[in-house]
Amino acid sequence: MGFDQYHEPADELPQETRTFARLCASLTEEAEAIGWYEQRLAVESDGQARAIMRDAQGEEFKHFSMDLEFLLRRTPLWREIAEGILFQEGDIVEHGEESEEEATEGAAERGAPLAGSTSLGIGGLKRAAS
C-alpha cells in the first residue's frame, strides 16, 4: 500500500519531519472520520445504532485531540497561537488574528526563529495596501 504524503523525497527528510508529517496525516484522517460519523448520525433513526456511532465518534475525537496535542508540543509557536484561540469567548477570528500577532511578535523579540509560522505574510500586505 503506497501512501504519498511527502512533497520532498522521503529519504532526504529527517525522521522528526517524517513523524510530524505522519501526525498531520493522522489529524486529517481523524477529522474526516468525525465528519463521517456526524453524517451517519444525522440520518440514523435507530437509537442503539446512534449510541454506538456516537461512542465511536468520541473515540475519533479523542485521537484527533491527541494528534493535535502532539503537533502543538512539537511546534511552540503554534501552541502559543492556539492558546489564544481555543476555549476563549468572543470572536474566533479576532482571537486568531490577535493571538498570531502576539505570538510572532513575542518570538521575534525573543530572537526565536519563525520557522513553522503559519502566516504567509498576506495580512501584512493587506495592511500595507490600506
Which residue ranges define each predicted feature?
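Iron-associated oxidoreductase/ferritin-like identity signal
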Residues: 1-130
